[in-house]
Amino acid sequence: MGLSVIILAAGQGKRMASSTPKILHPLGGIPLLERVVNTARLLNPHTIHVVYGNGGSHVREKLNYLPVHWIEQSQQLGTGHAVLQAIPFCQNEDRVLILYGDVPLISPKTLNSLLENTPSNGLGVVVAELPDPTGLGRIIRDDFGNILSIVEHKDAAEHQLKIREINTGIMTTTAMNLKKWLPQLNNNNCQKEYYLTDTVALAVAEGCPVGGVAAQCCEEVQGVNDRWELTKLERYYQRLMAKKLSLAGVTIIDPERFDARGENIEIAPDVVIDVNVILEGNVQLDRNVRIGPNVILKNTTVGENTEIHANSVIEAAVIKANCSVGPFARLRPGSVLEEGAKVGNFVEMKKTTLGRGSKANHLTYLGDTIIGKNVNVGAGTITCNYDGANKWQTKIEDGAFIGSNVALVAPLTVGKNATIGAGSTLSQDAPPDQLTVARERQRTIKGWHRPTKKE
């Protein structure tokens, strides 16, 4: 028996008050639907079917990299109708698991428990007990605790509304069962929809075993209906990430002011992360790294014993061991800092390698530049890499000393151990071991007086 997963993602999401389809809104930097797909893949299904509707072409365009089978539900007539669109693509002997594109934190542990504890010919649902179950379907049991049916909130009687055990919507049974039950559904209810939950009563009526598996926590089965629910779930997720990292030996100064936006974040023990830090995409931090407040790291690797000072923004960079960056530094894609390099305040780099032990301490732009070892780049230095049409490369060889307020008009090479005088504008190569100065000689004009204002 193989496993087919059906993810229902066709809801309109009106309460999000957004032109973006609900399932494309991110949680922890990843779209809601993608999170559910990633979890489903951990179960090793042979196929993942996604039933989409609202904003369909936009959803497929944005998430076309996902390994799923897309099925359009042109009319949103309820969850039962949505599953009916996908079930013809499932083999009769398949075990079918039904998930929801707006329930992003469901855990593989709970899903495995559901699959393992549901008889091969039975039906299983994930249930949860909530302090306030308003708006959610209730689990109806007999005196022996057996599940009899699920009643939606709008269709529930007064005594049923007092029940706190709710249906999460997550369900598993065989494809053969669904092919038998789904055509029997009707829309004789308050919402005039075909409810998937009505299959529970059909299963009970024919003696099919029905069981429930409890969710580990309320948050893992929390659906996202509006921005506020998404915000609360985001904070819960970030606290989970902070706790996971802390238990692995990372110091998170304030878990309430920490954001991890991506699933490929690897942080070694003894790293210290200050407040308002955002880690996005693929981020790797080695031992003893210190990240100051208000730092953004995206798709970046940082070597051991390196310190990133406050308010630095770093994207797609490689920073090796024992480096110092910032405060207020910006490293753009393609930046590489070799071991012991230093980038100070208000320095911007792009497609530039700063060699071992080299430093650019202040107020500098380095673009399309290869810098060797033990180079000093003075304050106010600019590599002029763009001529209005093309980018050109600058090379600064080992041991060079670049004075303050120097403009290097690429393409050019500054030779090994060369010294460039402050205020120079170079448009030709500077030879090694020599002082090169490219500026007008200072002169004083005798007898000159400042102009005076006319009366």
UniProtKB/Swiss-Prot annotation:
Positions contributing to acetyl-CoA binding: A379, N385, Y386, S404, A422, R439
EC number: 2.7.7.23, 2.3.1.157
Pathway of action: Nucleotide-sugar biosynthesis; UDP-N-acetyl-alpha-D-glucosamine biosynthesis; N-acetyl-alpha-D-glucosamine 1-phosphate from alpha-D-glucosamine 6-phosphate (route II): step 2/2; Nucleotide-sugar biosynthesis; UDP-N-acetyl-alpha-D-glucosamine biosynthesis; UDP-N-acetyl-alpha-D-glucosamine from N-acetyl-alpha-D-glucosamine 1-phosphate: step 1/1; Bacterial outer membrane biogenesis; LPS lipid A biosynthesis
One of the GO BP terms on file: cell wall organization
UniProt keyword Acyltransferase, yes or no: yes
Residues annotated as catalytic: H362 (proton acceptor)
GO molecular function: glucosamine-1-phosphate N-acetyltransferase activity; magnesium ion binding; UDP-N-acetylglucosamine diphosphorylase activity
Transmembrane regions listed in the UniProt entry: none
Pyrophosphorylase as annotated region, ranges: 1-227
Record's keyword terms, sorted: Acyltransferase, Cell shape, Cell wall biogenesis/degradation, Cytoplasm, Magnesium, Metal-binding, Multifunctional enzyme, Nucleotidyltransferase, Peptidoglycan synthesis, Repeat, Transferase
Region (N-acetyltransferase): 249-455
Family in the record: In the N-terminal section; belongs to the N-acetylglucosamine-1-phosphate uridyltransferase family.
Protein name: Bifunctional protein GlmU
Organism: Coxiella burnetii (strain CbuK_Q154)
Recorded name of the encoding gene: glmU
